[in-house]
Regions:
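Short, intrinsically disordered, mixed-charge
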Residues: 22, 54, 90, 128, ...
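Amphipathic alpha-helical transducer elements in NTP-driven molecular machines
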Residues: 32, 46-49, 62-68, 82-96, ...
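Glycine-rich, flexible loop/turn motifs
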Residues: 23-31, 38-40, 48-51, 80, ...
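C-terminal-of-GTPase-core extension/linker across diverse P-loop GTPases
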Residues: 2-6, 17, 144-352, 359, ...
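Conserved G1/Walker A P-loop phosphate-binding module
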Residues: 1-111, 139-140, 144-145
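Conserved Switch II/interswitch segment of TRAFAC-class P-loop GTPases
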Residues: 40-45, 72-82, 93-156, 169-182, ...
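Short, flexible surface segments
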Residues: 94, 354-355
Length: 365
């Protein structure tokens, strides 16, 4: 699963990405300093792993991960190929969700491509470019579907009607995710690879002087929240500059730095955790002397498909899953005691996995 980190030039996008991945993307004070997308694999914070590893005396801990892609900045007209528009659009098609960094700080030393700080205007610019790109794509498909209706095949009429709904939505400058589809329609829409079907998380990038303030005291943040609420999207408040500084520190120093700022966890941990949920992901856990590990699955995944994440043979020859809830296992003290207490369940092929399930799969191939 990939998240694309987007934003207008000089809003703090690359600075935030540096903090997320330690990848050192060049954060220079001029547009388009991020020419090719930088990719970083980030660990999903999960305190359960350390406790589980201690229980099993595991030699290795492997957390779940999520992939972030730093995508080159864009300006008005990106959908027509201006700026680095075409590159931006091709890269953003490949991600599953969007983290949209929005500037909510004033700094005379950092220019703004639109000559002034206005987060709602910035959001509107990018959203419009995505809508226009989708509109172009849908228009071509709609014209083709309409031309095939005369063949008498009903499927082209159904396709045309659905595309017309999508076209009308985009023509009103609304994203496709604002529409509701039945299961069959959703499959078709997924195959269109439209940009405005992707879930969005707004990262409101504040200045250092605003850290610790109540969000109600930050008018620019409030504007972003009001805009996002209308869309049904989330907002996460973060200071990219400080997060980048924290990311360069040893763990102990980073914790002290956070405490000095009056924070209990870094904004990055919140961002990664929120992004994981945004994608509808959960983790199940496996543990043993060799390794304790978190495995990423989509909510609603059944046991055989979850087993397939470990190895395809596990899914092909699935027999059952021995499952115990993480908290229950911790309370029992170890797996043997949990089993003796009747807390370990044997689940079959229809079992829907839950976040925090500690699992031992049985299979035969």
């Amino acid at each position: 699963m990939k998240l694309g980190v987007v934003g207008l030039p000089n809003v703090g996008k690359s600075t935030l990405f540096n903090a997320i991945t330690h990848a050192g993307a060049q954060a220079a004070n001029f547009p388009f300093c991020t020419i090719e997308p930088n990719v970083g694999i980030v660990a999903v914070p999960d305190e359960r792993l350390d406790k589980l590893a201690a229980l099993y005396s595991s030699k290795k801990i492997t957390p779940a991960t999520i992939e972030f892609v730093d995508i080159a900045g864009l300006v008005k007209g990106a959908s027509r190929g201006e700026g680095l528009g075409n590159k931006f659009l091709s890269h953003i098609r490949e991600v599953d969700a969007i983290v949209h960094v929005v500037r909510c700080f004033a700094d005379d030393n950092v220019t703004h491509v639109e000559n002034g700080v206005d987060p709602v205007r910035d959001i509107s610019i990018i959203n419009l470019e995505l809508i226009l790109a989708d509109l172009e794509s849908v228009t071509k498909r709609l014209d083709r579907a309409k031309s095939y209706i005369k063949t008498g095949d009903k499927k082209y009429k159904i396709e045309s009607d659905l595309l017309q709904r999508i076209y009308d939505c985009l023509a009103e400058e609304k994203p496709v995710y604002s529409l509701e589809f039945n299961e069959e329609e959703q499959k078709y829409v997924n195959g269109l690879f439209l940009l405005t079907t992707k879930p969005v998380l707004y990262a409101a990038n504040i200045g250092e002087e605003d850290i610790g303030k109540d969000e109600s005291e930050l008018p620019l943040v409030q504007k972003v929240k009001e805009y996002a609420q209308k869309e049904g999207n989330q907002v996460l408040v973060i200071c990219a500059k400080v997060e980048e500084e924290i990311s360069q520190l040893p763990a102990e120093d980073a914790q002290m730095f956070l405490e000095d700022l009056g924070l209990t966890e870094s904004g990055l941990d919140r961002l990664v955790r929120t992004s994981y949920k945004l994608l509808g992901l959960i983790s199940y856990l496996t543990a043993g002397e060799t390794e304790t590990r978190a495995w990423t699955i989509t909510e609603g995944t059944k046991a055989p498909q979850a087993a397939g994440k470990i190895h395809s043979d596990f899914e092909r020859g699935f027999i059952k899953a021995d499952v115990v809830e993480y908290q229950t296992l911790l309370e029992c003290g170890n797996y043997t005691k949990a089993k003796e207490a009747g807390k370990v369940r044997s689940e079959g092929k229809e079992y829907v996995m839950k976040d925090g399930d500690v699992v031992l799969f049985k299979f035969n191939v």
